[in-house]
């Protein structure tokens, strides 16, 4: 079969004949009786997939923008079964992209051209200008990027899987990620950036510190200790840590020392296990998120962000003295986000409000809006940035890593 949608045992196939019928039809196809029965008892996303295919074939008649067309293509890829995702190929050209879906034999079953909108991803273009790509990056024997983090770094949808595809399930979140596309971890490890294998333990909701069983949320979510316990250290890894925001924003903890010390203890564990390269990242200024700006705890969030980063940086300096043969660096995430926010403001992006106020959960029976992959907003929701901001962050971080970990 050309395309299978759904996951695990709950899959549904879309034949090449169905593709052709959708292409020739002026109306959105209806589900067959058997397809309706499967959709009723199992979540196959068959109807959503057919709608995406219809929108792709008929984007001109529907007056869809290039962003909406790309959104339909990305959503269809997210709905496709795991073994079919390699059938989706984007061929980039000078003024347009060709969006392709192939069958099992490598033949095109869908191929459309979409122009590159000059205003799309304007923020990423600005950051690219100020942070030109480093040339001839050589990271020595580093072959893997290993990530420990929370929803900012969760590229595998770990919280999505843990909550049985509930958090986040709203249409403005892509493939179980807490953003409207890809995360900075995926960009950074991709062939267009550092081109390294990615090993990602990050999970949405994760905290830096461990909390007692008397705290139900603390018991449910992951933390640095649990993530590190799942990891087998290697001297060929660059271990990257970005945690702490949920301790202050989600669990409303204020023991900065406990939050930082837990992270440092776990960093020492992997160093003892053989890791030679570590990058420790501070948290963004939590008071600058739409949630923080309108919260009664705005000042508290700002103070905690500053205190956390100052203490974390001091501890990293102590680690560098304790392990002089290792490459251990601290990255000021808050400064990077300030640069991105300023650039966004200068070109007219909304830096104050979230793109969506809906929340994380899809309401059964409701029709979610089309996924927008590049709105001119810094924040996709009240606390999480858009994928474009993730891309900008990866651009800046690539320059930092090239400068501090390169062997040339």
UniProtKB/Swiss-Prot annotation:
It holds the Pfam family Lipase_GDSL. InterPro entries: GDSL (IPR001087), SGNH_hydro_sf (IPR036514), Sif (IPR010637). Gene3D superfamilies: Secreted effector protein SifA (3.30.2440.10), SGNH hydrolase (3.40.50.1110). GO terms for molecular function: cholesterol O-acyltransferase activity; glycerophospholipid acyltransferase (CoA-dependent) activity; lipase activity; small GTPase binding. It is an enzyme of class 3 (hydrolase). Keywords: Host cytoplasm, Hydrolase, Secreted, Virulence. Induction: Very highly expressed in host macrophages and when grown in an acidic environment; repressed by H-NS and induced by SsrB. Disruption phenotype: Mutants have reduced cholesterol esterification activity as well as reduced lipid droplets. The keyword Lyase does not apply. One of its GO terms (cellular component) is host cell membrane. Its EC number is 3.-.-.-. It is found in: Secreted; Host cytoplasm. Its main location: secreted. The active site is at 151 (nucleophile), 381, 384. PANTHER family: GDSL LIPASE_ACYLHYDROLASE, PUTATIVE (AFU_ORTHOLOGUE AFUA_2G00510)-RELATED, ZINC FINGER FYVE DOMAIN CONTAINING PROTEIN. Belongs to the 'GDSL' lipolytic enzyme family. Effector proteins function to alter host cell physiology and promote bacterial survival in host tissues. This protein is required for endosomal tubulation and negatively regulates the formation of Salmonella-induced filaments (Sifs) in epithelial cells. Has both deacylase and esterification activities in vitro, but esterification is probably the dominant activity in host cells. Significantly contributes to cholesterol esterification, which reduces cellular cholesterol in cells and abrogates the ability of SifA to associate with cholesterol and LAMP-1 vesicles. Interacts with RhoA and indirectly with SifA. This is Secreted effector protein SseJ.
